[in-house]
Regions:
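Alpha-helical transmembrane segments of multi-pass inner-membrane proteins
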Residues: 23, 27, 255, 259, ...
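Alpha-helical transmembrane segments of multi-pass membrane proteins
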Residues: 15-19, 251, 255, 276, ...
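Hydrophobic alpha-helical segments
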Residues: 296-416
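Hydrophobic, glycine/alanine-rich multi-pass transmembrane helices and their short helix-loop junctions
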Residues: 267, 355-398, 402-403, 666-670, ...
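Alpha-helical transmembrane segments of integral membrane proteins
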Residues: 28-35, 260-268, 284, 288, ...
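Pore- and gate-forming transmembrane helices of large, multi-pass membrane proteins
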Residues: 253, 282, 321, 334-371, ...
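Extracytoplasmic
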Residues: 1-259, 287-299, 303, 436, ...
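Hydrophobic transmembrane alpha-helices and their membrane-interface caps
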Residues: 277-325, 678-727, 767, 794-798, ...
């Protein structure tokens, strides 16, 4: 690489910017305005399935399930009265149920003791009624109601806890967004022309975050109105978790963005103490941030949980480019008094380094673009775009603004008076720190490298203890109501999250087949016991068409408990299903398809880390396959499967992104320094901090989740920036003097100052995440900030030590 010609090219580029400054400014304003016009289109997606790519096979199966059977994610409202069957409580429960149906939007169904089906046979007739359709008005009636409710198998762990102390209201929302023009479920048992149905399906979108928020807001408003000592309420369920995460995400983004702007303002003031030194970098980074979000809106990409770090990240990274350019510009301008010449000099001196640092940071982020986790891939793409936009504004808009607006000059002082003044300033303190770094790294180079090697070995031992985890509930504070409620309901109902088994008989009315019904019955009974065989999980409620058949069969046989079994003859199965359907109940729609070809089995389990679900999903699939007759197909889906797939994709994504980032950044370093051996050596200060942080996580038991897995590639992309500036300047000064120590000294006293400042800003940009209420962001911010600080230490101590050992302390 011919640096001289490249630097000359940047000087020529600066000349053209200066010559056409007003035209350049107008062009930048127009392009920026066009981008900004798309900002209102930005959306938010905190759904669990939002982590995966849209074409992920597991997600596609889950979407097919939702299209057929509706949304499985429910809001669970738990009420713990003093007496569950007291007339006053039942009256209030009925009112509460009615208000939910009347006021909560996007509803599909509400189920409680008020309207749960009660199947009974009377006078040779099958009756499927609401449990509280005939409200008991006597002690004997209430006693019978209590006995019927507590002894009914279908109500256990669904609407009533085993000890009878708790009852629930289950709220199911529509699967599809009403904004898309489609109804919730047109499948059911309605007939529609095939072409019309297909067209409607393509137009549908699933319930949006905004609509989910409307549901949660309406529910919580009712809960607040009814909450009391006689009606104590807890609320759980995935829709609530999604809304809590969204609110936290919006609050954190707003808080962290404003804090980051304030931090940047403060450090720019301390560093430059000039209006242009504060305002121009702020304009650059704010435009870079807003343009990045606008690009997301333009592409139809929603803000998701991982991408919430983008604002603080783009602000922190973007200011580094401006600081490096302005540091050189002001030093030159104060010395010569020629503003335009100082602009040319600054771009000629720093232009290549800014491009290389931007490209390496973008490469570190873009390595996520191949991730199997869709949200992480989007972070990689738009994080890289934000870095490149910051480079664009720094190299084009920043010099243009400097050329247009007046810049205050600090008159150049004699070296003695300047040194005397700087001895009592932040700059003087920084110079003493850098002098100490030069002394330690060059006089004790072998010791520095030896200590680094020991740290590396210890870190590798820690890395072997790393564990992947994905549990969005653990991201929330322990005392937050949704987490407390989920723990309570998992304990009392044995489950708030479901795994869904879909069984396809392969033919119309295949569910009349006694073999298939017998297999479904066996599967449902076995699922009651296997949970505690795996990871100590107690299986909760099982729901399927088997419940309907058993209830109907019992009702048609004088309500005798001995007949709570599935019929064994095809004709009897068909008759009982037909009788149930004609009874007026629509419960069958949620359990089988309209052709009676496909059946659904739901199993509720406690909320745990996704790693606990992987073995369960595999075991469920194995047992289902063993029980079903030959030719009958099955698949396991549901929210639990989404969690398990997210964890699997997380591990694959991390391995891919780390490998790609390390390879690409190494190639770019080799290209920059123009030497393979030197390029490889220069990667040591970049990789060591990441290794230490990962080792620290393993030793302390901090998990690798969807956020902390990002640390390696992000930190590598950022750490290499300082190394690029160090190597770029070291080679320049070494060519001039041929003296290693002198080259290191000049490097740290020019680029070193900017490296320290940008590291402080960058690390604070991530450390502010520790102010979040979400545990995953606290871990991510603290660990990434730690990696960035370690990277600076590596570039101030390890990189000079390596150069001393490679080139020797000779003139």
């Amino acid at each position: 690489m011919n640096r001289t010609s490249i630097e000359s090219g940047f000087i020529t580029f600066a000349d053209r910017l200066i010559r056409w400054k007003w035209g350049v400014l107008l062009a930048v304003v127009i392009l920026t305005a066009l981008l900004f016009s798309h900002l209102p289109k930005i959306t938010i997606d905190t759904s669990n399935e939002g982590f995966l790519r849209a074409d992920d096979p597991v997600l596609l199966q889950y979407n097919e399930f939702r299209e057929q059977f509706g949304r499985e994610e429910v809001v669970l409202i738990a009420i713990r009265p003093v007496d569950l069957f007291a007339p006053e409580f039942l009256t209030k429960l009925k009112q509460f149920h009615a208000e939910i149906e009347a006021t909560v939007p996007h509803l599909d169904e509400v189920t409680s003791l008020v309207n749960v089906r009660y199947t009974v046979g009377k006078d040779d007739e099958l009756l499927v009624e609401d449990l509280l359709e005939a409200f008991p008005d006597s002690d004997e009636g209430r006693k019978q109601l209590k006995q019927a409710a507590l002894n009914h198998p279908f109500y256990q762990d669904l609407l009533i806890s085993e000890n009878g102390a708790l009852t629930t209201v289950v709220i199911e929302t529509r699967a599809f967004s009403e904004e898309a023009g489609g109804d919730a479920l047109t499948d059911g048992f309605e007939d529609a022309p095939a072409e019309e149905s297909a067209t409607a399906e393509t137009e549908r979108t699933f319930l949006t975050d905004e609509e989910n928020g409307e549901v949660v807001a309406a529910v919580m408003q009712l809960v607040e109105a009814y909450q009391g000592e006689d009606f104590p309420i807890e609320v759980a369920g995935s829709p609530i978790v999604m809304e809590v995460l969204k609110k936290s995400m919006q609050s954190d983004m707003r808080q962290f963005t404003l804090t980051m702007v304030a931090i940047i303002f403060l450090f720019l003031f301390l560093l430059f103490r000039r209006v242009t030194g504060i305002l121009t970098p702020l304009v650059v980074v704010i435009l870079s941030l807003v343009a990045t979000i606008a690009l997301m809106a333009l592409s139809g990409t929603a803000l998701k949980l991982p991408t919430q770090i983008l604002p603080s990240f783009v602000l922190a990274v973007g200011v580094g480019d401006s600081v490096h350019i302005l540091s050189i510009f002001y030093r030159r301008y104060d010395h010569t008094g020629d503003k335009l010449e100082a602009i040319r000099f600054a771009l000629g001196h720093s232009g290549l380094a800014v491009v290389m640092t931007s490209l390496t940071t973008a490469a570190g982020l873009f390595s996520f673009s191949t991730a199997e986790l869709g949200a992480v891939a989007e972070l990689g793409v738009f994080g890289a775009a934000g870095v490149l936009l910051a480079m664009f504004y720094s190299l084009i808009l920043l010099p243009t603004l400097l050329a247009i607006f007046p810049v205050r000059r600090k008159h150049h002082k004699s070296s003695d008076s300047e040194a005397d003044e700087e001895g009592n300033t932040v700059t003087g303190m920084m110079d003493r720190l850098l002098n100490r770094a030069v002394s330690v790294s060059t006089n004790h180079a072998a010791t520095v490298v030896f200590v680094a090697a020991i740290l590396f070995i210890v870190a590798i031992a820690g890395i072997t203890q790393l564990q992947f985890k994905h549990d969005v509930m653990k991201w929330l504070p322990e005392e937050i109501p949704i987490r407390v409620a989920t723990d309570h309901l998992d304990r009392d109902l044995n489950g708030t999250i479901s795994v869904e088994v879909i069984v396809d008989s392969g033919e119309q009315e295949g569910l009349y087949n006694p073999q298939i019904i017998g297999a479904l019955s066996k599967i449902q009974d076995e699922l009651d016991h296997f949970g505690d065989e795996l990871n100590g999980l107690d299986a909760g409620k099982r729901i399927s068409v088997i419940d309907v058949l058993r209830e109907t069969n019992q009702a048609l046989n004088e309500n005798q408990a001995a007949y709570y079994v599935t019929p064994k003859e095809r004709q009897l199965i068909a008759q009982e299903l037909l009788l149930f359907e004609n009874s007026g109940s629509d419960d069958l729609e949620n359990l089988v398809d309209s052709e009676l070809r496909t059946a659904r089995i739901t199993l509720r389990l406690p909320w745990r880390d996704a790693g606990s679900y992987t073995a369960i999903v595999d075991e469920v699939q194995e047992r289902v396959d063993q029980a079903l007759p030959e030719g009958v197909e099955s698949q396991v889906t549901g929210l639990m499967m989404i969690f398990a797939r997210t964890l699997d994709a997380m591990m694959t994504s991390m391995a891919q992104s780390y490998t790609i980032a390390a390879f690409v950044v190494t190639m770019m370093m080799i290209l920059l320094v123009g030497h393979i051996r030197l390029g490889l050596i220069s990667m040591v200060p970049n990789l060591l901090p990441i290794t230490i942080v990962l080792g620290f996580m393993g030793i302390t038991g901090l998990p690798l989740d969807a956020f902390t897995m990002l640390i390696g590639s992000i930190a590598l992309g950022l750490a290499v920036d300082d190394t690029v500036h160090f190597m770029h300047n070291f080679q320049r000064y070494y060519r001039q003097s041929g003296d290693t120590v002198e080259a290191i000294t000049h490097t740290l006293h020019t680029a070193g100052r900017a490296m320290v400042v940008t590291t402080i800003v960058l690390s604070l940009g991530f450390l502010i995440f520790m102010r979040s209420d979400m545990n995953n962001l606290i871990n991510f911010g603290g660990l990434t900030g730690m990696a960035i600080i370690l990277a600076l230490l590596a570039d101030l101590l390890l990189a000079p030590a390596l150069m001393t050992l490679v080139f020797g302390k000779r003139n």
